[in-house]
């Protein structure tokens, strides 16, 4: 029994040492998302809406001061692993890492706020109703199908997402409401800043595909090899000849998307 315990302890120590070594050798992936002009069709809501309970609420129009920065905000960059610790599901230890806060999508003024959230597989999203009316949130997407039923102001319902992919979320009662939950296959993802710069830190050595997804333009992929001691820079040019009405075709499951750009 004592010998078995000693072997188990040695195995645990060896596993921890391997993960720490991977963390020490981890590199950064950085890059820039280049977008030349607006790709998304502006959506404008009516200036005044009367809720079903008779409460008049003023709704603001989508007025973007910086259309290109707005387009960059609709981009997510993440990794798909071919070989290496990420493909095996290993987590690289980070002494300074903090627990990620739960994502939340509010139902506010008959809109989803925000209308795009990114979570790693296995995480959840809360959907609080902030409006003085009922909402009924649902999705028919392959990675996650759900229907939360009707619920009133002040109530919150949560959905977990066990599979990676694109999940389009709608409201049965308000057809204009739409949001997207992008579920990444791991925790190595980033969203660019207003200038289009992104950074994915602590990537272990291995072979990967860097995926850039734009909510209207779809998926773009580049293969890279991360070697110890060498960071990588990967830029993406999002085409300008995209029909913004084709969101449904662009927003397919990344595991089912046909062809790389």
Annotate each language-model stretch with its function.
Residues 1-15:
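Bacterial N-terminal signal peptides that target proteins for export
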Residues 26-261:
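Extracytoplasmic copper-binding redox domains, predominantly the cupredoxin/blue-copper superfamily
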